[in-house]
Amino acid sequence: MSEFKSAVKNELKPVKYRHFNRGVNKYSNALHCQLRIGRSFLKSHSFSINFSQDDLCLCNRPETTSHFLLNCFLFQLERESLLAKICQLYPPFSRKSMQQQTFILLNGINLENEVPDARNVQIFYAVQKFILQTKRFSKTFSNLFI
């Protein structure tokens, strides 16, 4: 009976990744989570729920999560230190597609392993440090969009 319960539990209850609750602080962890689930105050997320008139960044490109994390020239300096840290932790990162890189920054690496990859905590710290350094979600930056 216990084997049956274990099999059902493994099938119906997804594995919880412990690194999702780690970060610089609760605020940065919340921002990171919002980016992961597509409900942040980026213009594309706000536009999708009619909270914004358009989905364009200040650089006139759609302000998506991948644009914010990997492309927007407004955050180039902050991004350089983020990518240096990520490439140090996970060297194959630079050879991944933009979609895969975005997934890694939002979710971590080696999620299919039973034993969590310890580098995910460091990846999350680096991403959250980037989010805070950009000040993209501060009230001052948000006022530029009004």
Give the residues covered by each predicted segment.
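C-terminal functional segments of enzyme domains
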Residues: 1-16
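Family-specific functional microsites
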Residues: 3, 19-146
